[in-house]
Amino acid sequence: HFITRLLGEVGIWFRFTTDTRLNIDVVEFYDSQQGYEKGLTLPSVPPSGQHSKAVDSVWGMECHHNVVQKQVSTRDYNYRQATQDMNTLVDATRGDVTTYGDAYHWADNYLTPGSAHDRNPAPESGAFYARIRHERYLNGQTRAQGITSCPTLSPGQVLKVTGGYEVADVFAQGVVITAMRTYARRDKDFAVDFDGIPDSTDFGFRPEPGARPVMAGTLPARVTSTTENDTYGHIDKDGRYRVNMLFDRDNWETGFESLWVRQSRPYAGDTWGLHLPLLAGTEVAIGFEDGNPDRPYIA
């Protein structure tokens, strides 16, 4: 879950393949439509008795449509550039009239807003996270389901279905396989239930990142320094400290037990404020913004 959450937060999906040359399993990571495997086309033929003419086919096709958000707005605060405008707004559909509403997300933890007009915004910028979120919403706009007898079907493939009026345009133009369930037994033929989304040039598959761990309350720690018995506070230019979490049993180089951690202060501004430096050994309580373990601060 930890790996899939981190990858899902930045829109990366993966699949397992086999290297026939080295006879090993391989994990492939992708973040765009370039990772799709294309070229699989199957006919729409419902099963009839025990005779399939030795041809793999697709049947039981369904499409479900939902109204999703028209655009995504994000905002964050970067104390390093406190006056910078961190608002971004992205519409990945390029004007789809069937979408509606604005999804607003606060504190995706980015440092720069990025360009909302760039289809490939700077990684981990506000526009980047807004586009990832909107593409994830668009993944739920059209959901495709079906059953096939093809044993080589795998997630990440683009399946096209040929046939008559029973084949919806979504299947005729191509469906990206996002999930599948394979089953077979003695009294029933081999079959694969699959889920998918339309193969679109406007957006790609974006996995759900899953729930993030929540750090409730505070944790005890002590301020550290690279100098033993330091008489001054060991801080950086932004007034941040390094701390030693008291629950941590690993051994670290003195003064490098953590990344720089910001201290919350009762009075602070652009060019004014009050900061009483903490000396090495001072006990502090570590809190977490919105319970996010990636955003600790000295309470």
Q: What is each stretch, according to the model?
A:
Residues 1-299:
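Amphipathic alpha-helical and helix-coil boundary elements used as assembly
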